[in-house]
Swiss-Prot record:
Keywords: Calcium, Hydrolase, Lipid degradation, Lipid metabolism, Neurotoxin, Presynaptic neurotoxin, Secreted, Toxin. Its main location: secreted. InterPro entries: PLipase_A2_dom_sf. Expressed by the venom gland. This is Basic phospholipase A2 13. Disulfide bonds: none annotated. Snake venom phospholipase A2 (PLA2) that inhibits neuromuscular transmission by blocking acetylcholine release from the nerve termini. PLA2 catalyzes the calcium-dependent hydrolysis of the 2-acyl groups in 3-sn-phosphoglycerides. It comes from the Eukaryota. GO terms for biological process: arachidonate secretion; lipid catabolic process; phospholipid metabolic process. The lineage of its organism: Eukaryota, Metazoa, Chordata, Craniata, Vertebrata. It comes from Bungarus fasciatus (Banded krait).
Length: 31
């Protein structure tokens, strides 16, 4: 179950994670 979740994050969430990091850095820069 945890492995499946991890695999889902690695496959479908990689680009989303990158976008999230960029958004987080953008928000942090203007905080």
């Amino acid at each position: 179950n945890l492995y499946q979740f991890k695999n889902m994050i690695e496959c479908a969430g990689t680009r989303t994670w990158i976008a999230y990091v960029k958004y987080g850095a953008y928000t942090y820069a203007y905080t």
